[in-house]
Amino acid sequence: MTVLHSVDFFPSGNASVAIEPRLPQADFPEHHHDFHEIVIVEHGTGIHVFNGQPYTITGGTVCFVRDHDRHLYEHTDNLCLTNVLYRSPDRFQFLAGLNQLLPQELDGQYPSHWRVNHSVLQQVRQLVAQMEQQEGENDLPSTASREILFMQLLLLLRKSSLQENLENSASRLNLLLAWLEDHFADEVNWDAVADQFSLSLRTLHRQLKQQTGLTPQRYLNRLRLMKARHLLRHSEASVTDIAYHCGFSDSNHFSTLFRREFNWSPRDIRQGRDGFLQ
């Protein structure tokens, strides 16, 4: 597995924060690093496989990656990221207690993926741009300024996370996308889902298309197919069982959609013919 080292990304040995844009981020094999990072998805779509679990990421997704996590990117489509790297929550010169603002693992569950709306994403970009402008300066005031900006970024992300920010349709759409991650196998009635998240059906279609580039049903099908591909690679369940588990009532229809999406059949993926290294 590829290991990324802080010496290759941080501007100096004393720097506690570094900015690493990926515009765009191509498919990238599984790796980990000796530093932590906050991945901010600017726009585009892709699959983020995090500690073996696949997540669909789009504009507004924020991922918190620790130094012992492993992850990869695949099936990217114009995926543009900004990575905010930091050595460790306790390696800041002027800040203490940052760990309390970061996601916390509870009973083996780590809430690694958050979502923010477009207006918050704009504020995030401004903070990141200010940090990036100061990267070449190593004096104490500049170091303190970068660390303060990092603290502001954490506060903004925490206050703007889905649990605390549902006042507009963009935030409700983000909550809907998070709900689909957990309920992708359910029979989805889009009228009922729109009502559940206080969106008109027209607004749901328009905003989801703007954010993901896909219609709601196309997005749901892709999400189901991504989950199915993960199970084909990492479980012993039959193709038919996996199809049903991922929300497809007809395994033949599932196989047709699967081949159309990935240019490989489910059996090809099961046998590793696509070249994926497990």
UniProtKB/Swiss-Prot annotation:
Q: Which GO terms describe its cellular component?
A: cytoplasm
GO terms in the biological process aspect are:
positive regulation of DNA-templated transcription; rhamnose metabolic process
Domain HTH araC/xylS-type: from-to ranges: 174-272
Q: Where is this site: Interaction with sigma-70?
A: D241, D250
Q: Read off the Pfam families from this record.
A: AraC_binding (PF02311), HTH_18 (PF12833)
Determine if Cytoplasm is one of this entry's keywords.
yes
GO molecular function terms noted in the UniProt entry: DNA-binding transcription factor activity; sequence-specific DNA binding
Give the UniProt keywords, A-Z: Activator, Cytoplasm, DNA-binding, Repeat, Rhamnose metabolism, Transcription, Transcription regulation
* Compartments in which it is found: Cytoplasm
Q: Which InterPro entries match?
A: AraC-bd, AraC_XylS_family_regulators, Homeodomain-like_sf, HTH-like, HTH_AraC, HTH_AraC-typ_CS, RhaR_RhaS-like_N, RmlC-like_jellyroll
Where is the DNA-binding region? 191-212, 239-262
Subunit structure, briefly?
A: Binds DNA as a dimer.
- Protein role: Activates expression of the rhaBAD and rhaT operons.
Q: Which PANTHER family does its entry note?
A: HTH-TYPE TRANSCRIPTIONAL ACTIVATOR RHAS, HTH-TYPE TRANSCRIPTIONAL ACTIVATOR RHAS-RELATED
The name on file for this protein is HTH-type transcriptional activator RhaS
Q: Which gene encodes it?
A: rhaS
